[in-house]
C-alpha cells in the first residue's frame, strides 16, 4: 500500500532512505487524515519547533532525493559494468572498465616483467591504474579506487590492509604476500588466483560489496594478458 520498493527505497536492511521515508510519511499522513479528526496545529505557537523542522526539511528534501537517485543509478550502472569486466579478455578493455570509482582494484604478487617488456600503451594503462611502480618486484601490494591509493606496502612489509566499499558501508581487505604466495582476503575470504610467479588482481564492487573478478597478469609479445582460474 505504501508503494515502497525494496530495490530503491532502503538505505540498509533496517532503514529506508529519503525516497522510502517520503512514501512512508505520505502514506501515514493520508491514513491519519482519513481515519482521525486531528486538529491542525500549523501556525500554532505551541508547535513552532515542529513548523521549523518541516520548513528545514522542505529546503533540503529535493536535493536529498536527487542525491539518492544518483546513488541508485550509480549502483545499478555498476552491475552492467561488472558483467563487462568479467567477460573482458583483452587487458586494454578490462583496465579501462575497472578504472572507475564504483570499483576497488587490489593488486598483489610477483611482477616478472619490466617496462622494456611492454608496448607503450600497456605502460600507459598501468599508469592510469596508479600501478606505475609495479615493475620487477616480488612483493608488490596496492589497493586502489579510481586511481587513488587506499592501501599499499610502501614500507616494504609483506602485508597491507584497508576498508573497502562505499561511504560507511565497508568490509575489511587484507593482502598477504608471505611465503611468496599472494593472498587477497576480502571479509575473511581469499579471492586471489594464488599464482606465485604472477601479479594477482581482484576487482571489488564498492556499492554492492561483492567481488566482480579475480585475474592474474602475464606478458606475451609485449602485451599484458589476463588469466583466470
Regions found by a protein language model. Give the residues of each.
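Short acidic-hydrophobic catalytic motif
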Residues: 69-229
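Extracellular glycan-modifying ectodomains
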Residues: 1-79
Amino acid at each position: 500500500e505504501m508503494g515502497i520498493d525494496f530495490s530503491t527505497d532502503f538505505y540498509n536492511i533496517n532503514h529506508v532512505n529519503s525516497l522510502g521515508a517520503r512514501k512512508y510519511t505520505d502514506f501515514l499522513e493520508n491514513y491519519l487524515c482519513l481515519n482521525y479528526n486531528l486538529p491542525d496545529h500549523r501556525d500554532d505557537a505551541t508547535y513552532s519547533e515542529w513548523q521549523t523542522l518541516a520548513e528545514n526539511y522542505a529546503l533540503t528534501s529535493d536535493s536529498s532525493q536527487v542525491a539518492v537517485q544518483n546513488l541508485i543509478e550509480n549502483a545499478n550502472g555498476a552491475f552492467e559494468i561488472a558483467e563487462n569486466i568479467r567477460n573482458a579478455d583483452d587487458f586494454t578493455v578490462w583496465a579501462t572498465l575497472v578504472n572507475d570509482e564504483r570499483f576497488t582494484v587490489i593488486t598483489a604478487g610477483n611482477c616478472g616483467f619490466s617496462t622494456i617488456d611492454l608496448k607503450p600503451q600497456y605502460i600507459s594503462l598501468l599508469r592510469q591504474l596508479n600501478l606505475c611502480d609495479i615493475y620487477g618486484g616480488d612483493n608488490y601490494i596496492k589497493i586502489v579506487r579510481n586511481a587513488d591509493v587506499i592501501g599499499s606496502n610502501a614500507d616494504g612489509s609483506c602485508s597491507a590492509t584497508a576498508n573497502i566499499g562505499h561511504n560507511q558501508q565497508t568490509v575489511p581487505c587484507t593482502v598477504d604476500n608471505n611465503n611468496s604466495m599472494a593472498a587477497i582476503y576480502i571479509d575473511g575470504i581469499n579471492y586471489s588466483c594464488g599464482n606465485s610467479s604472477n601479479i594477482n588482481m581482484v576487482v571489488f564492487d564498492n556499492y554492492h560489496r561483492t567481488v566482480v573478478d579475480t585475474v592474474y597478469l602475464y606478458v606475451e609479445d609485449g602485451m599484458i594478458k589476463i588469466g583466470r582460474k
